[in-house]
């Protein structure tokens, strides 16, 4: 099990790297919505662009709304990332990509008071020869912060399936070993019976059974 846990992430990283190199694509993956107190939490916000839309002016705004409160700005990217004055000041870290398709941020040292609704607004003005269209996308992330990490149902199911697979493989190997052992034993018994039958034949019969050689 530990070996599988070490090899599986490595194989996944190799596969992701190979796909990203051979087939450069953008996938809008939703953000996680649960965090543990004291740990960093990445708020994922991905807004993909088409290949012909690379030239664009992008502005990113992150808002936070506490439970029962109103939205207020906590982070802004406009010609460079900058943190605005807010209760999150000093705990926000830019985690986006150079092409600004991934505009995620990370909240450091998450507290229970960080629970609430996070809004990621991405505004783009594309630079075409004939026109300059403006597009705005919004991602909502309802975050819940807990004191301790809860049991992940997916990981529990995966672990159970892994144990079932190990038991199945063990039984299959045991059956194969028994089958091979019986097969070898039968072959040895047949060889011993043939040898015993040959030794039981009188010497006269052995000489008579020989094929005469013509001169």
Curated annotation (Swiss-Prot):
Xref: InterPro entries: Ig-like_dom, Ig-like_dom_sf, Ig-like_fold, Ig_sub, Ig_V-set, Na_channel_b1/b3
Gene source species: Homo sapiens
Keyword Cell membrane carried by entry: yes
GO biological process: one example: SA node cell action potential
Gene3D superfamilies in UniProt: Immunoglobulins (2.60.40.10)
Role, per record: Regulatory subunit of multiple voltage-gated sodium (Nav) channels directly mediating the depolarization of excitable membranes. Navs, also called VGSCs (voltage-gated sodium channels) or VDSCs (voltage-dependent sodium channels), operate by switching between closed and open conformations depending on the voltage difference across the membrane. In the open conformation they allow Na(+) ions to selectively pass through the pore, along their electrochemical gradient.
Parts of the chain that traverse the membrane: 157-178
Gene behind the chain: SCN3B
Annotated consequence of substituting residue 48 to A: Decreased voltage-gated sodium channel oligomeric complex assembly
Sugar-modified residues: 95, 109, 113, 121
Cellular compartments per GO CC: cytosol; intracellular membrane-bounded organelle; membrane; plasma membrane; voltage-gated sodium channel complex; Z disc
Listed name of the protein: Sodium channel regulatory subunit beta-3
């Amino acid at each position: 099990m530990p070996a599988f846990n070490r090899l599986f992430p490595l194989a996944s990283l190799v596969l992701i790297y190979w796909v990203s190199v051979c087939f450069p694509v953008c996938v809008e993956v939703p953000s996680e919505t649960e965090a543990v107190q004291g740990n960093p939490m990445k708020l994922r916000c991905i807004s993909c662009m088409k290949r012909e839309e690379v030239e664009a002016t992008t502005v990113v705004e992150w808002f936070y709304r506490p439970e029962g409160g109103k939205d207020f700005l906590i982070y802004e990217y406009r010609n460079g990332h900058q943190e605005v004055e807010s209760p999150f000041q000093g705990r926000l870290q830019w985690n986006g990509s150079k092409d600004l398709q991934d505009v995620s941020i990370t909240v450091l040292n998450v507290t229970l008071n960080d629970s609430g609704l996070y809004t990621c607004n991405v505004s783009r003005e594309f630079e075409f020869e004939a026109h300059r269209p403006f597009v705005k996308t919004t991602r909502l992330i309802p975050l819940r912060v807990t004191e301790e990490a809860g049991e992940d149902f997916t990981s529990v199911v995966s672990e159970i399936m892994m144990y079932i697979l190990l038991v199945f493989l063990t039984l299959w190997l045991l059956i194969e070993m028994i089958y091979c052992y019986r097969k070898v034993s039968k072959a040895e018994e047949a060889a011993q019976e043939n040898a015993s039958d040959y030794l039981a034949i009188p010497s006269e019969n052995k000489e008579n059974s020989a094929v005469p050689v013509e001169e």
